[in-house]
C-alpha cells in the first residue's frame, strides 16, 4: 500500500471520494508485479490528475488490527511518500469526485486513525531535515568567525563558507547557486538580487564590518541564515556589548531588538502585509532605514524559488499558513555607509513562534 502526502504551491492536496463527505490523501494498493514507488506515482496521477510532480519516499509504516481494508488484522506495511505537484490535468479517472487544495489540514478525515498520524510523521521528519540544514548554516558562521582576519579577500571568505557548507551536509545552494553572499565595509549597505551578485575584490581591514548571508540546501530543503560580523583591532568581536565602534554596536543592537519585537508582535493570524507595515514603521521610529532592494523583510521557505511569498505590502497571506518563513531586516542609519543584517528561519509550533 502507498499513501502520498502532497502539496501544490504551498497548499495541501486532498481528495474527496464520490460516495463520501470526507477527505483523504491519495493512495492505494500495489498491483501484481508493481514497484511500490510506481504504485505511489500511479495512484497520485489517478486520484489527483497530477501530470507534473516530484515524488519521494518518506518512510515505511505498519498497521495492525482489523480495519476496512484488512479483515485478518495481521500487520500490514505501507510506503509513505511526499509529492510536490506542479501541474494538474484537471481530469480524474477514478472513484474520486474532486481534488481540493487546502491551507489547513481537514477535520473530517476518511481515515482518521491513520492518515493524520502519517502527516504528523511527515511533518516531524521534515522539521528534522530543515533543522539539520539550518544548523549547517549556523555552524558555518561559527566556523568563519574563527577564520576571518585582516588581509583576507571577500572571495576567499565566500569560498571557505561554501566549502564548509558542503562538508557539513549541503549538496547545493538554492539562491542562484551562491552559497555565501559576502559584503564588507561600505558595501554592507548594498542590496542586490542574487542573480546580479558578484563578490568584490575587497580585503578585510583591521577594523571592519562584514555581512554574510548563507543559502545551503540538501535536496530541496533550504537553509537561510545571515549574520553581521565585526572585526576590531584585527579580531572578531563576538559579544555585541564589547564592540567599541558605537555606530556598529547600535546597528547590531537594533537587529536584536527587531527579532525580539517579532516574537512580541506576531501570531499565526498576522498577515505578511501586517508584519511588513509594522516592522518598517518600527525601523523608522528607531532611526533606521530598510535597505532591501525590494523593500521586503523576509519570505516563505519553499522548495522552488518562484513559489516564495514575501513580507511585503498587499500580501494578505497569514504567517501561520506557511510552514516556515525568514525574518531578515537589512538596515542602516540614515546617510550611513554601513549596513546590518540578521536572518533566522521561524515557524509556529502550535500557537508559539519558534526559531528553527
Task: Tell me what each language-model feature is.
Residues 7-46:
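Conserved Nudix-box catalytic region and its N-terminal flanking loop in Nudix hydrolases
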Residues 31-54, 61-122:
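Unchanged
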Residues 9-12, 20-22, 86-88, 185-190:
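Short, charged/polar surface micro-motifs in flexible loops or helix N-caps
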Residues 1-3:
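Acidic, metal-coordinating catalytic segment for phosphate/diphosphate chemistry
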Residues 28, 95-97, 225-230:
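"Short basic amphipathic alpha-helical interaction patches in structured regions
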Residues 125-356:
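Active-site neighborhoods and metal-handling regions in enzymes and metal-associated proteins
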Residues 6, 80-84, 101, 230, ...:
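Short, well-ordered beta-strand micro-motif
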Residues 9-11, 84-89, 104-105, 233-235, ...:
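Short loop segments at secondary-structure junctions
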Amino acid at each position: 500500500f502507498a499513501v502520498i502526502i502532497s502539496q501544490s504551491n504551498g497548499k495541501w492536496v486532498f481528495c474527496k471520494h464520490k460516495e463520501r463527505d470526507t477527505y483523504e490523501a491519495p493512495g492505494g494498493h500495489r498491483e501484481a508485479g508493481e514497484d511500490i514507488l510506481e504504485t505511489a506515482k500511479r495512484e497520485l496521477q489517478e486520484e489527483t490528475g497530477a501530470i507534473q510532480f516530484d515524488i519521494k519516499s518518506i518512510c515505511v509504516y505498519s498497521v495492525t488490527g482489523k480495519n476496512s481494508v484488512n479483515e485478518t488484522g495481521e500487520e500490514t506495511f505501507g510506503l509513505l511518500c511526499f509529492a510536490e505537484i506542479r501541474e494538474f490535468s484537471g481530469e480524474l479517472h477514478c472513484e474520486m469526485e474532486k481534488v481540493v487544495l487546502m491551507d489547513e489540514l481537514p477535520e473530517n478525515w476518511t481515515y482518521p486513525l491513520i492518515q493524520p498520524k502519517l502527516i504528523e510523521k511527515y511533518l516531524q521528519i521534515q522539521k528534522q531535515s530543515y533543522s539539520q540544514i539550518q544548523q549547517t548554516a549556523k555552524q558555518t558562521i561559527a566556523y568563519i568567525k574563527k577564520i576571518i582576519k585582516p588581509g583576507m579577500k571577500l572571495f576567499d571568505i565566500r569560498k571557505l563558507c561554501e566549502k564548509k557548507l558542503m562538508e557539513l551536509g549541503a549538496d547545493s545552494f538554492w539562491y542562484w547557486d551562491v552559497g555565501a553572499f559576502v559584503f564588507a565595509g561600505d558595501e554592507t549597505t548594498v542590496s542586490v538580487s542574487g542573480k546580479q551578485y558578484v563578490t568584490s575584490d575587497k580585503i578585510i581591514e583591521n577594523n571592519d564590518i562584514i555581512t554574510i548571508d548563507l543559502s545551503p540546501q540538501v535536496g530541496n530543503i533550504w537553509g537561510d541564515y545571515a549574520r553581521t560580523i565585526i572585526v576590531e583591532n584585527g579580531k572578531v568581536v563576538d559579544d555585541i556589548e564589547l564592540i567599541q565602534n558605537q555606530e556598529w554596536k547600535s546597528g547590531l543592537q537594533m537587529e536584536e531588538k527587531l527579532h525580539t519585537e517579532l516574537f512580541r508582535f506576531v501570531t499565526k493570524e498576522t498577515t505578511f502585509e501586517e508584519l511588513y507595515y509594522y516592522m518598517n514603521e518600527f525601523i523608522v521610529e528607531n532611526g533606521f532605514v530598510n535597505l532591501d532592494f525590494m523593500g521586503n523583510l523576509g519570505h516563505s521557505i519553499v522548495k522552488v524559488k518562484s513559489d516564495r511569498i514575501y513580507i511585503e505590502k498587499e500580501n494578505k497571506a497569514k504567517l501561520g499558513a506557511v510552514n516556515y518563513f525568514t525574518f531578515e531586516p537589512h538596515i542602516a542609519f540614515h546617510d550611513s555607509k554601513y549596513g546590518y543584517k540578521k536572518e533566522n528561519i521561524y515557524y509556529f509550533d502550535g500557537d508559539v513562534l519558534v526559531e528553527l
